Amino acid sequence: MATVKVYDQNKQESGEVTLASDVFEIEVRPEILNLVARAQMAAKRAGTHNVKTRAFVSGGGAKPWKQKGTGRARAGSNRSPIWRGGAITFGPSPRDYTFKVNSKVRSLALKMALSSRLAAESLMVVKGIVLPEAKTKHFAKVADTLGLTKALIVAPEENADLTRSARNIPGLTLTTVDRLSVLEILKHKQLVLLEGAVESVQARFEKKGA
């Protein structure tokens, strides 16, 4: 089991916490991280793109000119894909981009993402963040003190004041343990766990038996 230092919001050491080796110290397999990250990105796609093919574009029923005798190239419809204002060939149509990934693989990928941040020494445990006011400037000051530039901050549960204070700071994302995802971890260079989140993350896997 790994032991990491716990810091307060002023970046002063305030203790240590032990991280479960079966959650934070497993072998990282890039192909599994890639699979789950792609699945999560695909799930975000609306898939509402659409174009009009020959079947849907209006007009074009009449032959523009007779087949022979005009000197022009033959044409059967003014809605042909090669005409201006015509239909689209092989364009996109609405579709569902999601694909299934087994729950055990998703769970394994999340452990790998957490392990990758610990191995890269870019995981920090912070005792807690208490702001005098729910203002962006106060959160920005704490982030600057902790040296956070592109960081995912994980709270054990929803905190409206922290959410409101952090949402406009570029590069910082505040989330909760139940919304923690592989994609979000990989998108950020730093991972910050508020102290209560460590136990919640480990309990999340215990409940699943993963």
Curated annotation (Swiss-Prot):
Annotated InterPro entries: Ribosomal_uL4, Ribosomal_uL4-like, Ribosomal_uL4_dom_sf
SUPFAM superfamilies: Ribosomal protein L4
Gene3D superfamilies registered for this protein in UniProt: 3.40.1370.10
Region (Disordered), start-end ranges: 57-78
GO biological process: one example: translation
Gene Ontology cellular component annotations, sorted alphabetically: ribonucleoprotein complex; ribosome
Keywords of the record: Ribonucleoprotein, Ribosomal protein, RNA-binding, rRNA-binding
GO function term, MF aspect, one: rRNA binding
Pfam families documented for this protein: Ribosomal_L4
Superkingdom in the source lineage: Bacteria
Keyword flag rRNA-binding: yes
Subunit and interaction comment: Part of the 50S ribosomal subunit.
Family according to the record: Belongs to the universal ribosomal protein uL4 family.
NCBIfam families: rplD_bact
Main function: One of the primary rRNA binding proteins, this protein initially binds near the 5'-end of the 23S rRNA. It is important during the early stages of 50S assembly. It makes multiple contacts with different domains of the 23S rRNA in the assembled 50S subunit and ribosome.
PANTHER family: 50S RIBOSOMAL PROTEIN L4 (PTHR10746), LARGE RIBOSOMAL SUBUNIT PROTEIN UL4M (PTHR10746:SF6)
Protein name stated in the entry: Large ribosomal subunit protein uL4
The organism's taxonomic lineage, starting at the top: Bacteria, Pseudomonadati, Thermodesulfobacteriota, Desulfovibrionia, Desulfovibrionales
